[in-house]
Amino acid sequence: MALEYLEQEPWRFLISSATVIFLVLNIAAVLTLAERKVSAYIQLRYGPNRVGPRGLLQPAADVVKLFIKENVSPGRADRWVFLAAPIAMFLPAAAVWLVIPFGPGMVVADLNIGLVYFFAITSIGALGVIMAGYGSRSNFSLLGALRGAGQMISYEVPLILSLLGVAMLTGSLSMVDIVEYQAGGFWNWIIWPQLPMFLAFFVSGLAEVKRIPFDLPEGESEIVGGFMIEYSGMTWALIQASEFASMAVMSAVASTLFLGGWQPPLPFLDLGVFNWLWLGIKTTLLIFVFQWIRWTLPRLRMDQLMDLGWKILVPVTILWLFVTAGAMLVI
């Protein structure tokens, strides 16, 4: 009887969703170590090297430390909104993984509107930032939340436009169909005809994740941590996990839509059921670029951030949509 229940679609979806959340939390923990190691490499340091061999157990030590820290809520805070905000930030980052295909038949939910689902879920992240700023009842938190909301909503526009070209080329909104469209070798990857769109998507992804040079909602040197200033312990850890999970999911989506997803760069490198390794390699490389930018570029001013989004990325993506449409008509 238990096996019959597990074969039913709701149970399968719930188990798959729980597995995805567990994996996302572990990915976020590993990325904290990767972030420290990359920053140490860039700054000619060793990085964490005390806990476990070569510091590999540092994430476990961090989790234990954060578990035993007290979760302090400000006296004036709207408690339920304050505590719900980290969850509202983390769940969208985890939910996107449900539609990312890791290999042939390896997807939790193969939606025929996968791109629309991605747009809808990522836009919810701004709500969590607003909840954190409003629920904290702190001027710095509120200012950071307003910055974050303006930034994330502004960069949703070029983010969506950058993926319309992909949908036009493939004729589908399903991520599985888009990956299968890129089969046959790296010369069939969508990044080549859609290079400006890929760059626009990547820059918009940086802004959506709120990473340097787009970390104005946090801005430690300006607004003392922004919307995160009143959080501590595991609530603070969940916000950090949502940031790292968002970075990983943006890299995975970029790899899926522009770099062939699970498709190998050359046909003879096909690994069959282990093709998910190719998606992992591509995603890891893009995560490294995220971290490289984080530790080498300064923060932009608010006016520079808005100018980049509205005056450069939006016109470029609209122009390339017309170029793509014209090329499809001619060819």
UniProtKB/Swiss-Prot annotation:
Main localization, broad class: membrane
Cellular component aspect of the GO annotation: plasma membrane
Catalytic reactions of this protein: a quinone + NADH + 5 H(+)(in) = a quinol + NAD(+) + 4 H(+)(out)
Compartments, as annotated in UniProt: Cell membrane
Annotated membrane topology: Multi-pass membrane protein
Gene Ontology molecular function: NADH dehydrogenase activity; oxidoreductase activity, acting on NAD(P)H, quinone or similar compound as acceptor; quinone binding
InterPro entries: NADH_UbQ_OxRdtase_su1/FPO, NADH_UbQ_OxRdtase_su1_CS
Residue stretches spanning the membrane: 13-33, 80-100, 113-133, 159-179, 183-203, 249-269, 273-293, 311-331
PROSITE patterns for the chain: COMPLEX1_ND1_2
UniProt keywords, alphabetically: Cell membrane, Membrane, NAD, Quinone, Translocase, Transmembrane, Transmembrane helix, Ubiquinone
Hydrolase keyword on record: no
BP terms from Gene Ontology: aerobic respiration
The enzyme's E.C. designation: 7.1.1.-
Record's function text: NDH-1 shuttles electrons from NADH, via FMN and iron-sulfur (Fe-S) centers, to quinones in the respiratory chain. The immediate electron acceptor for the enzyme in this species is believed to be ubiquinone. Couples the redox reaction to proton translocation (for every two electrons transferred, four hydrogen ions are translocated across the cytoplasmic membrane), and thus conserves the redox energy in a proton gradient. This subunit may bind ubiquinone.
Subunit structure: NDH-1 is composed of 14 different subunits. Subunits NuoA, H, J, K, L, M, N constitute the membrane sector of the complex.
Family designation: Belongs to the complex I subunit 1 family.
Protein name per its UniProtKB record: NADH-quinone oxidoreductase subunit H
Organism: Rubrobacter xylanophilus (strain DSM 9941 / JCM 11954 / NBRC 16129 / PRD-1)
